[in-house]
Every structure is written in structure tokens, then in C-alpha cells.
Amino acid sequence: MNLSLREIQKLLVTVAADVARRRLARGLKLNYSEAVALITDHVVEGARDGKLVADLMQSAREVLRVDQVMEGVDTMVGIIQVEVTFPDGTKLVSVHDPIYK
């Protein structure tokens, strides 16, 4: 299987997001990398499902609450920017203050 660098990166985000989901299900708090991966995956999959940029910017802010992440992670993640492909082209989705307080 020959994957491009972009495809490899997308797969790594997906795997990290799956790990984060399993840890949340066990009641564990997420670290920085897990939180970013989970929110990033939400945006990528939402774009794949045909959702609008504005809708994804809002819904991504509801993926995680402050009580689901380790102490300080909410302040470390000020903005997440994800370049994703929509039916009408590639766009940069910016999610400000992505962890719900």
C-alpha cells in the first residue's frame, strides 16, 4: 500500500482519536495530543459528511468539556486549525477555544 504523507497523517489522527474515545469511555481525562486529535477528527469526518464550515466550527467546540481533559489542557489548546477537503475544495477550518468550559 502506497500512501502519501497527507494520507499517513490523516490515518495517525484517526488512530489517536480512536484511542482518545476509548480512554474517555473508561472515564480517563485526555491529554493535549488526545484532545487535539479528537477535535481534529470531528472536523475531518464532518467535512466528509458534507457539513458546512460554520457548522463544524461551532460543533467542534462541543466535542470536549473542560472536565474531560487533564488540568491545563483547556488553556493550552487556544485554537485548532484543520485543512480539510470539502466538495467545493480544500478549506482551513479554525476552531477557537475548542474545549467547552
From Swiss-Prot:
Gene Ontology MF term list: nickel cation binding; urease activity
Swiss-Prot/TrEMBL catalytic activity: urea + 2 H2O + H(+) = hydrogencarbonate + 2 NH4(+)
Major place of residence: cytoplasm
A GO cellular component annotation in the UniProt record: cytoplasm
EC annotation from Swiss-Prot or TrEMBL: 3.5.1.5
Superkingdom: Bacteria
Localization terms from the record: Cytoplasm
BP GO terms, sorted: urea catabolic process
Record keyword Cytoplasm present: yes
Gene3D superfamilies, per database record: Urease, gamma-like subunit
Listed InterPro entries: Urease_gamma (IPR012010), Urease_gamma/gamma-beta_su (IPR002026), Urease_gamma_sf (IPR036463), Urease_subunit (IPR050069)
Annotated keywords: Cytoplasm, Hydrolase
Pfam families membership: Urease_gamma
EC main group: hydrolase
Coiled-coil region list: none
Involved pathway(s): Nitrogen metabolism; urea degradation; CO(2) and NH(3) from urea (urease route): step 1/1
Subunit structure, interactors included: Heterotrimer of UreA (gamma), UreB (beta) and UreC (alpha) subunits. Three heterotrimers associate to form the active enzyme.
Family designation: Belongs to the urease gamma subunit family.
HAMAP family to which the protein is assigned, alphabetical: Urease_gamma
Record protein name field: Urease subunit gamma
UniProt source species: Ureaplasma urealyticum serovar 10 (strain ATCC 33699 / Western)
